């Protein structure tokens, strides 16, 4: 496919707005992609994930009965941009840059991956089978898709993720894991004027806990903990009997994830007669670099050189992706293989037209020759 034809295809995808929480909108694009894949002779199956998110689309070049471990490619069709974003931030081309909500993250990369799979299928290359998953809820944690991603990973020799390239076109070989914390303090209500001494202020307790939680951040170890939301109380004339916070933690290794989780679950109240209710869990496991992923990177770098660009690895990133799931399962995973650009999740989000041709050539060569 020529660069103008590929660009036109990506523009069609961008013109269909797909916020994560709008199941119908995501389904509209999923059906368009499905029809395109079927027309190219690929199998393409939609799986409904309930009413809250759109369907998951699996596109594959497997022949009937082919159960060999293959290449799992991960992409997502949802974006962080709400409906109406396109009217405020219209699709437009300014020189080498293509602006539009969700183009860089990650409709361009997803379209490039699909086009590469169509190229490999058309050539009838004797390569590993490829399963390409278009996830509908990646931007909100992939809670509905996770089990399907992990199930596909069980039959994968490699995992390639079409998330946007990092600065300089670099790829991703490690990501932090993300955990969540919900903490409630339960005290005792009282009239703030008549019986203040009988009250047990849950907000006061929560203030102590916020300081303790923020103190767990350790930049040297790569651990961060952020209290992002607090709420409690009913009025200034009532000693509050309940207060709650929501926080997240990010960790570079599974060992640190377990350590932080243990510390969170061991938190104790600082105020007499106040009880804490703690719920902490890991939403995405850490994506750790391994010898096997280094070997995959080396292979990818050879194919990038053939396509005319140098593929370097970016430092570990605090942002997570669906690659966290595959890497945690021991599947050699390479991420950030999408197009070059900048401004993900912002109004100035854009990708570079000049990166489309080289990235398509790279993806096609990589899918064709990985063994």
Give the ranges of each region predicted by the language model.
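Short glycine-aspartate micro-motif
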Residues: 70-72, 98, 105, 157-161, ...
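Short beta-strand segments
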Residues: 74-75, 133-135, 159-163, 184-186, ...
